[in-house]
Amino acid sequence: YFLLHGVTGSGKTRVFQKLIAETLKQGKQAILLVPEIALTPQIVGQFQSLFGNAVVVMHSALTDRQRQDAYQRMQNGTAKIAIGTRSAVFAPVQNLGILIVDEEGERTYKSENAPRYHAIAVARKRCQTHHCPLLLASATPSIESYYYAKKGVYTLLELKKRYRNMPLPEVTVVDMN
């Protein structure tokens, strides 16, 4: 397992794209989890511009027909990349090559409704079963993941600079009282 700890704007999405491209070259499929439905259009657009029709979207706001189509395409191998929220961890891949969890410290990866599950725990088990890498990524990793990385359970990868050395945005605190 790997923990990619990168500052905001360091190019984590670009790393995901390169890793997934390598996975597809090996004839395997990939799952990319994002913490919220609102984040899917932007990242799906970026991946579709690179990988075209190989990308499917999976989240709870899809219609039954859209969900069924995405599942069938992943199951029969016509789609190679599933991008979605926590439920996408159950995508019916035949040959999983990598599973990536973006913003892994977000609490939205834990389902509070029945059936209760933690998508990251499911991801670990799927990667163990498929003998493939799990990449957890965040600018603010969970304490658990950071602890495992520091103890050597996870391999810690760090992106300490922003892409092209862009400066961080300037923040001003204003007292509204």
Residue ranges and their predicted role:
Residues 24-25, 75, 127-128:
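Conserved ATPase "switch" residues in P-loop NTPase domains
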Residues 1-6, 31-33:
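Short hydrophobic/aromatic beta-strand immediately N-terminal to the Walker A/P-loop
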Residues 10-15, 22-49, 66:
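Conserved Walker A/P-loop ATP-binding site and its immediately adjacent core
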Residues 46-54, 58-82, 93-96:
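Conserved motor-coupling elements within RecA-like helicase/translocase cores
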